[in-house]
Design a protein with these regions (language model features):
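Amide-donor transfer/coupling interface in amidating biosynthetic enzymes
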Residues: 23, 141-143, 180, 184-187, ...
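Residues that mark the start of a beta-strand
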Residues: 102-104, 129, 254
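Short helix-loop-beta junction
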Residues: 117-132
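Short acidic/histidine-rich motifs immediately flanking catalytic phosphotransfer sites
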Residues: 144-152
Length: 282
């Protein structure tokens, strides 16, 4: 096992009679040196990264359109992950007052959805009483969302993205009276919150739930590369009016992206939207 750790870790291993061998030290610059007996070789980190990355670039060139593979290859070293956590963050879970009732949350999913368990767990840890709601529950009328204060539309590939991302899922709401009525009644109330993640975000865009007062609504378009993009990046949270994100203003946090249709096409100027975060680099 090879890993990087502070020098204090050596004492921990010694206490447990575990033998370790130091093979190197972290460096600040671009050049690093490998020593083997009397032989000493110095390499450029940037050059080796390009060599390592080239195979991925060649494969990417066969898949990505509009020069995105070349742009990715030229820019990947300039896109450093930088984080800035809120000053009040201590890494501890919130203390939930067991004497108070938990607000009710519903995790909404469709065939082909995933990550509903992860969202349910996160909501439970945040203090919600969580229930699982499948679209068949809403379509049949078994679930009306009455008494629910928070809904979360999960990610995945609902209906295998046939006809487009979340198109079929949106249709299940639009063309089934009971599901449509349940959703409309939920958003008419003033004591509700909602979140759409990944495919759930695409769903809310398709249903025109974002800035419903606009005459022309935004859409999610295919990525410029014309292919599914998945990667880890960072976003900076701006000043915003979000109940869930306003306290994170000024922070830069890591996020996963994973979409085929992940490009927002917004018809109005930025000031017409409550954009809570932007990519930490262009």
């Amino acid at each position: 096992v090879v890993f990087q750790a502070n020098a204090e870790v050596e004492a921990t291993f010694a206490q447990h009679n575990i033998e370790i061998f130091k093979i190197g030290s972290a460096i600040d610059g671009d050049a690093f040196t490998v020593i083997n007996g009397e032989d000493s070789l110095t390499f450029s980190v940037a050059t080796l990264r390009d060599t390592w990355y080239k195979t991925s670039f060649l494969l990417d060139s066969k898949q990505s359109k509009n020069g995105m593979a070349q742009a990715r290859f030229e820019n990947y070293k300039n896109q450093k992950l930088q984080f800035s956590f809120p000053s009040h963050f201590d890494g501890k879970l919130p203390v939930i007052d067991a004497s108070k009732p938990r607000p009710k949350a519903a995790i909404i999913r469709e065939k082909g959805s995933n990550s509903e368990r992860e969202m349910a767990n996160a909501m439970y840890l945040a203090g919600f009483d969580v229930k699982d709601v499948h679209m068949t529950d809403l379509i049949s009328g078994r679930e009306t969302l009455e008494g629910i204060q928070f809904i979360g539309a999960v990610g995945g590939f609902s209906n295998s993205d046939v006809l487009g991302s979340a198109k079929g899922w949106a249709g299940a709401f639009l063309y089934n009276e009971k599901a449509n009525t349940a959703l409309k009644n939920f958003f008419k109330r003033e004591d509700t919150l909602s979140v759409g993640i990944c495919n759930g975000c695409q769903l809310m865009m398709e249903l025109e739930l974002i800035t419903p007062e606009h005459e022309v609504h935004g859409k999610m378009h295919h990525n410029t590369s014309n292919k599914h993009e998945s990667g880890f990046t960072s976003v900076t949270v701006q000043k915003n009016n979000s109940v869930m994100l306003s306290t994170l203003e000024g922070t830069t946090l890591g996020v996963w992206i994973s979409h085929g249709e992940g490009k927002f096409k917004l018809p109005y100027s930025e000031d017409k939207y409550n954009i809570v975060a932007k990519y930490a680099y262009e």
